[in-house]
């Protein structure tokens, strides 16, 4: 049933926790896990300085590659088929768009991301994906300490 699993990661501990859940599901189902990182370039589009915009974009993409390497390493350790993708734009929209175009069976993501506002938000990205995706979504809660 879950042969094509998409997990969104933002490099946070919450994103890594979601990746672990996705990889466990992939291992159990024999499926392939695709990790996606979306560089939120919408937040930077209003910046007046093109060089600053370019620098921030490059930093976001570098951060994304590092986040995806972490998930890839876990996938190798667990023996799960893995691939990765990077997108730019609004994270919620890009996750849904990628999942639909790639024919994913499920989307997995952390209920909260990097934001410190998690008491106000399910996680704006998670909420957008849950509300708008036609594909089943599994949100992974923050680990309780």
Feature names for model-found ranges:
Residues 51, 86-90, 112:
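Short beta->alpha linker loops
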Residues 106-128:
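Glycine-rich, Arg-bearing micro-motifs that act as flexible, cationic patches
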Residues 53-66:
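A short acidic, glycine-rich active-site loop
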Residues 73-107, 145:
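Structural beta-alpha unit
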Residues 1-17, 132-145:
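Intrinsically disordered or low-complexity boundary/linker segments at protein termini
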Residues 50-54, 101-103, 125-126:
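Short, hinge-like loop/turn segments at secondary-structure boundaries
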């Amino acid at each position: 049933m879950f042969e094509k699993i998409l997990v969104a990661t933002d490099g946070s501990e919450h994103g890594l926790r979601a990746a672990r859940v996705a990889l466990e599901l992939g291992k159990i189902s024999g499926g392939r896990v695709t990790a996606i990182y979306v560089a939120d370039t919408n937040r930077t589009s209003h910046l007046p300085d093109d060089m600053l915009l370019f620098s921030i974009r490059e930093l976001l993409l570098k951060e994304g590659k590092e986040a995806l390497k972490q998930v890839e390493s876990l996938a190798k350790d667990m023996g799960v088929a893995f691939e990765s993708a990077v997108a730019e734009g609004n994270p919620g929209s890009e996750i849904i768009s990628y999942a639909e175009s790639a024919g994913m069976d499920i989307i997995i993501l952390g209920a909260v991301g990097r934001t410190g506002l998690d008491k106000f938000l399910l996680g704006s990205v998670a909420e957008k994906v849950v509300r708008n995706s036609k594909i089943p979504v599994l949100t992974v809660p923050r680990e309780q300490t």
